[in-house]
Amino acid sequence: MTGRLSSVVSPKVGYWLLVALSAVPAVYLLFAVQYSAITVPFWDHTELIHWIADWREGNFHVSSLWAPHNHTRPLVYRLVMLMNAVATDWDVRSEYIYLYLSIYGTFACFVWLARRLIGEANAVFPVTLLSVSLILFSPVGHNNHWWSMMFQLDATNFFIALSFLLVFTRPEIWSCHVVAAVSCWLAAFTLTNGFFAFVAIIITFQLSATKFTRPDRFAVFWVINLLVASACYLPGMQMESSSTHPSALELLEFSLTYLGAPLGGLLWFPYRSMFQLPMSIAVNLICGSILLVTCAALSLDALPRLRKRHPAAMVLFGFAGFAMLSAVATGWARATFDEYGVANGNASRYTIFGSYLLLGQVYYVGAALVQGWWGEQAHSILARRVVFVLAGFFACAAFVSYGRAWRVYADAHEFNRSLAQTYVWGLDPVPEDRFIHPRPEAVAYLKRQLQLLELGPYGNRAYVKAQSPVGSFSKPVYLSAARTVRQRFVATDDGLKRLSLKFVTPNGKATTGVVRWQLSEVGSQEPLARGDVEAGGARDWATMTLRLPYVVASRGRTYELALSGTGEDSTALGLPLYEPVESSGQPVLLSDDGDAQHGRFVMELTTEYAK
């Protein structure tokens, strides 16, 4: 590639043109995600509402983040997503920040790896960088781009890449092994593939040991980490996903397809829409077979260097081992999972780990060309030209696939628009609910919690306010255990969603306890909503908003708000009462020690209606 460029431009200009070209896939990914991102809760990602609701209601337990899901314990994923949801009222758009950090962080690891193995002051570096960039940001893995839940895979990929970078480029430094082990633990408790990274590192270090039959000290360190992590991970885990497992032939076909998909998809992009799973495995199976053959040939060449723990050889063996373990383990669970069978190996999301087989060979070949490992100068020049021609063909085909892939991101963009429109106020089922989640009861729970807590697509919505008219301020009433304060009002519009009122603190810093509130429709036995207000956290004359479930047909209906407290009047929160004016509604009903009496005052109440 650089040979052809040098006939038109200088080698230095050609070098920097290739480096600049390496940034194109990264920019492409940025625009693709910004355009196609799903920005509302969708499918398995909706399960996060359970943790968010528990957090908001004060029922959250850290141990719940440990619960298994689909053969994994995604502790890191849940922790990051929950903290972000709490901070942003579950604005799904903000989750793509972490997806970007994971993907671009992985690219930074791979760039650093290229610098360590190949160096920068040569023509091979920009060719390697371009190849790595095309593979890492590949639209073949589009499923890991337009859905923020795939942060789980992208973060795992970053932790694994960091671990490999540290231990394979500095194999004799203990501090690197310790940091890499921490990174592998994080990967394992994000997705199960992190355990395959443990195994790949163990095998690579044992193969490179001075005496193969004697346990290597670094391999022992990683074995201990693997055993301890497994002891924490496996108890209580249900590993069976299918009543049947694949035959040896089916497992082989799936694994070869899985390993060949990153290359085959870039040579000719096979996806036509965001959810399409290509049924033909021929191209990817052939690519996977070729990659295994070339990997075997390169491994034979690298074996003497592996014994010396040369970083390029360790990368080749470690990357290939990880990819193969991922392929076989995934195939065991998914090759006969449904009617798609071994075609599941074409799934877009799997290419993120299958690509390590190709990446390991890219790095080793690059290092071999720079180090001149392949014979005399004439043979080395010939090898370099062959590699550059193949790299040029690969880059041209890949950029064509990048262009053809935009239709998938456009499809995701349209799907997101349709999906967002299903989040309308109210809990009545709509046909499009099936796009949110296949189980209607899960959709009903999700919408009920989102509307009640005003999260996600129901956050920052417009509200129409209606304030009850009041006269001059009269006095506060203490909300203690001694009394209950009730007031009835008539809703002026449909879509009742909030009530706002003010509290006062006549007891100052001595204010403690809890104020309990309940809203009911007059004539109904069941309350519409109830909740607590921490009296100690209230500020004098500050407005307090009570969030309600969305009430579709509230216009003209009469409701009653009841407020009660705990403790004595000397520590109670106060509720300001006002002189009534015409049309201000029914007076406050005070219940003192069980004796009900009508007062001649009203509370200042603002009703808000969602539109």
Q: What does each model-identified segment do?
A:
Residues A462-G523, G531-T558, A562-K611:
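Beta-sheet-rich sandwich/jelly-roll-like modules and their strand-loop junctions
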Residues F125-F159:
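Aromatic- and kink-enriched transmembrane "portal" helix at the membrane-lumen/periplasm boundary
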Residues S64-D89, E253-G265:
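Short hydrophobic/aromatic helix or loop-helix immediately within or flanking a transmembrane segment
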Residues L5-H71, A85-T128, W174, I203-F205, ...:
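Intrinsically disordered, polar/acidic, low-complexity terminal segments
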Residues T213-L234, F317, V389-L390:
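Hydrophobic alpha-helical membrane-interfacial segments at the cytosolic entry of transmembrane helices
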Residues P25, V127-I135, W222-S230, R307-T336:
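Transmembrane alpha-helix segments characteristic
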Residues C176-I203:
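Membrane-interface alpha helices of multi-pass inner-membrane proteins
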Residues I160-H177:
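Membrane-interface transmembrane helices that cradle and orient dolichyl/undecaprenyl
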